[in-house]
Amino acid sequence: MAFLELDHVSVVFPAVQGLLSARKSAPVVAVDGVSLSVEKGEILGLVGESGCGKSTLSRTVMLLQKPTEGRIFLEGEELTALSASEVRKRRPDFQMVFQDPYASLTPLFTVYATLKEALQSRRKRTFAQTRDDVAELMEKVGLSPSLMRKYPHEFSGGQRQRVAIARALAPEPRLVIADEPVSALDVSIQSQILNLLIALARDLSLTMIFISHDLSVVHYIADRIAVMRKGRIVEYGEADKVFSSPSHEYTQALLAAVPRL
């Protein structure tokens, strides 16, 4: 069995009563029967336009959203069968890197405080151990430990995203989900963050789901690609094959939108 396996996962949001109307809206099928797998140490790219269900699927994998149907397995264990208390215990196993690093970091926390909190979620440490572990995390993401007493507003966008990545690594997660982690950054910085994620995945044997609307970015970082449209996976395969010879018309449209030099 694969490291992570999704078996016919669906997420349906129920109809909502309008404030000014007696009519209910139709139920929203955000994720529709998705089945896919991720191998240990692999980067899976999940690509699709806004509103296709990528973020809902990622929240479901992280146990933040309960699926309406289907099952999710991590190393053979059915996550969807866990109780609420068991889910809370597993939170450190799943970490996320968000699109906007400034919004995802607490502005009143120094880097040290942010990383300390993330480290303590896995196990308690002495002051000296915490200081050393914070320094090590910062070095892993290409930041000088001398910056650990600074606040988010004192960093550039790329540096803030490095802090966010360090925070995700702190609890030693089993799975990292990066949701559009470079789309809010300058083009000149995007490749640096992508190369950092590739190096971390290789050096730490990280398993990662990388989410983006940009097929070229996903092709650059991913081992395999899953293309999502209207809640469904319409294409799934090796990254080079999907990028060079897409079989589905939607993937072909995404490829046609990639800028050519």
Please identify what each model-predicted range represents:
Residues 70-78:
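Conserved ABC transporter NBD signature motif
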Residues 78, 128-146, 255-256:
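Conserved ABC ATPase "signature" region
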Residues 151-155, 159:
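Conserved ABC ATPase signature
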Residues 172:
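Conserved catalytic motifs of ABC-family nucleotide-binding domains
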